[in-house]
Amino acid sequence: MTNVICGGKPETATNKRRVCVLCGGRSGEHEISLLSARAIIEALDRARNEVIVVGIGKDGQWHLQPDPDYLQKQSDPRTIHLDPSGPRVVLSADPEMHGLLILDDNATACSLLPLDLVFPVLHGPYGEDGTVQGLLELSRIAYIGAGVLGSAVGMDKDAMKRLLRDAGIPIPDFLVVYQRKWSREAQKCQDAVWERFAPPVFVKPANLGSSLGISKVKTKSDLPRAMETAFQYDTKVLVEEGIEGREIECSVLGNDEPVASAPGEIVPRHEFYSYEAKYLDEQGAALEIPAKLSEEMTEQVRQLAVAAYRTLCCEGMGRVDFFLTRDGRLLVGEINTIPGFTKISMYPKLWEASGLSFAELLDRLIELALECHERRRRLKIEHS
């Protein structure tokens, strides 16, 4: 680990690029973030990059991890955790510092740890939603992934779907229910759902991923319980029509000229592609890579993935999820601006099937982040 000396700036032994992997977070996807970070840390080129790991606890505190390979030493995804023994740090919003302030035991800034680039491996609110991206913009630190706007609309499924719909991109029908209205007029909300849809429907928090808080409602009597489950995670909930069909995913990479990978297919063995199926049950789903699609449908998936990516102002990376109905309609379900990066995650596996290894993918993401950062740096911010 880089030596920390109060009152001074830490020195690095080499001219390597200092990359901070930021992981954990306050959301319900904390452990998933750690699993993704573990794979990224292992694959980063240590000959070119000095890897710094900062973990955000569920309480929101940031800790520099004394051993950047600490996550690698944990094998059980159910119990993976951060090392709380490292010093607390905060990211300075001062653009002259562009780094981490290391705090002493009295929570007083002790020293500065400058950063060249941050990889926010944060899934869900307080990380994937534009909040951390905004802080990094203030700090003038390059970072991987979408900017503030793309991250925010990519997190909020309501805003995302309205933008896609307005752009003419086909999506499943949906409606939004707010907690304040549900608490006053639950029956009226239920009536509105069943006037619009027939069972089954999916009920999901508007601002969460990894299938957390999502329920498949097969009967009308199950709706209240599903709504209460979703409201535990968000004050805004989506009710979406149930689509019978195949689940197709496509990875997108790039800034101004994004490119799409070969599509893949998820064949869940659970009722749907749940949190357990994604991360805890090794037999939870089969991944078909590449998906068994016609050439025409493959090209349609790739074109629509890029169109959705551009519509939602994404940069760097994104994974677009689709439904392919039995009558051949292709519908965009959502986009993930910080997709899963575990060794079994679809995003890196699709690029691997398209000829880009995990390590090469990380190198390309770093290049794209530096490209975006340089472009923003050159923008004028005052009248002259």
Ranges and model annotations:
Residues 51, 142-143, 171, 201, ...:
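Hydrophobic beta-strand scaffold residues
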Residues 2-17, 22-26, 46, 292-384:
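ATP-dependent carboxylate activation and anion-phosphoryl transfer catalytic cores
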Residues 215-303, 324-331:
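Phosphate-binding site of ATP-dependent enzymes
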Residues 134-143, 219, 224, 353-356:
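A glycine- and small-aliphatic-rich helix-loop capping segment at beta-alpha/alpha-beta transitions
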Residues 164-165, 193-212, 235-244, 248:
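ATP-grasp fold ATP-binding core
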Residues 33, 171-176, 200-228, 247-249:
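Glycine-rich phosphate-binding loop of ATP-grasp-fold ATP-dependent ligases
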Residues 1-149, 153-159, 163-166, 177-188, ...:
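ATP-binding N-terminal substructure of ATP-dependent carboxylate-amine bond-forming enzymes
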